[in-house]
Amino acid sequence: MERRAGSRLRAWMLLLLLCPVQGRQKDSGSKWKVFLDQINRALENYEPCSSQNCSCYHGVIEEDLTPFRGGISRKMMAEVVRRKLGTHYQIIKNRLFREDDCMFPSRCSGVEHFILEVIHRLPDMEMVINVRDYPQVPKWMEPTIPVFSFSKTSEYHDIMYPAWTFWEGGPAVWPLYPTGLGRWDLFREDLLRSAAQWPWEKKNSTAYFRGSRTSPERDPLILLSRKNPKLVDAEYTKNQAWKSMKDTLGKPAAKDVHLIDHCKYRYLFNFRGVAASFRFKHLFLCGSLVFHVGDEWVEFFYPQLKPWVHYIPVKTDLSNVQELLQFVKANDDIAQEIAKRGSQFIINHLQMDDITCYWENLLTDYSKFLSYNVTRRKDYYQIVPRRLKTEL
């Protein structure tokens, strides 16, 4: 009974957040008409997804597996393994086996955690899982071959899976995250506690970004911050590739800032790095308004996050960033509602159960396209569950 009442309350709150925004700001006027119209269209076209059986993301699985509807042959799989495009795994009689070679052991471990969570319900299969940053199957490649990657653009046929960072193996940032980002379930709790300490009205209204220069697409925001520090507080930090101040646009590197301390700010920026950015999902849980720059790189959950509904979309060259910041400052209640919708989506649809469920649905559907019986490779060793980690 309580669960039904809770579901009705959440549905009512969602309907309230999805109400059209036109005419609700006294001074919006024609100055902001373009943005207000985009928000209204986005809300009118938005269809909230179900929380049942992680069906929210089923369309992503379906689209990623479409190229393989003709079947995956033993010969095709042998070619993928031969080309070393990732780590080769086999699931046989509800046991997980792997070749010895893995470029990033902690990343493989993060992947294996989720497979082992559902392995007792999985049929026999084999697959190649890429734990590099970059996808491996460009669309011009013929024939299309099955490789699992955590992120891609529309130019690739890789099959997306939930990244290892939901458990472990994320980027190490010393001294904040010396063993890397991980344990999404624990991190969620930390971020939500910080968000409660920094409600919207207490947040600093200066836009905020801290990160390393993994992509020059971030440069315009750093330069804007130097020109107008009251509008934007954005600085480069060091990463493993840092050699001199040239790598931080001629200024000393800033100190790294814990993600929970980002919650002090009302407007947070997300950029792609080498591929999709791991910080994206974290920013929403601050209850802040996320400015998402560019839309080329995606992870499996991105397609259900909609521009103007859950975040503010920013052009890749940042040519519209100042106008967007002026808009949200002039329309604070609208900005807050977008932030709430973004936060609620991640809270409701990106729980650890959703990650595990996605892995199970993805591998189960994928296995149906294998046109042969998998034979265990004798030199592969069995992966067994490790002791549960209870700290980040």
Swiss-Prot record:
Tissues/organs with expression: Widely expressed in newborn and adult tissues (at protein level).
Family per record: Belongs to the glycosyltransferase 90 family.
GO cellular component: endoplasmic reticulum lumen
Record gene name: Poglut1
Designated name of the protein: Protein O-glucosyltransferase 1
N-terminal signal peptide: 1-23
Region (Interaction with the consensus sequence C-X-S-X-[PA]-C in peptide substrates): 103-107, 172-178
SMART domains: CAP10
One record GO biological process: protein O-linked glycosylation via serine
EC number: 2.4.1.376, 2.4.2.63
Binding site for UDP-alpha-D-glucose: 177, 212, 218, 274-279
Cystine connections: 49-56, 54-357, 102-108, 263-286
Functional summary from the UniProt entry: Dual specificity glycosyltransferase that catalyzes the transfer of glucose and xylose from UDP-glucose and UDP-xylose, respectively, to a serine residue found in the consensus sequence of C-X-S-X-P-C. Specifically targets extracellular EGF repeats of protein such as CRB2, F7, F9 and NOTCH2. Acts as a positive regulator of Notch signaling by mediating O-glucosylation of Notch, leading to regulate muscle development. Notch glucosylation does not affect Notch ligand binding.
Any GO MF annotation of the entry: glucosyltransferase activity
Subcellular location: Endoplasmic reticulum lumen
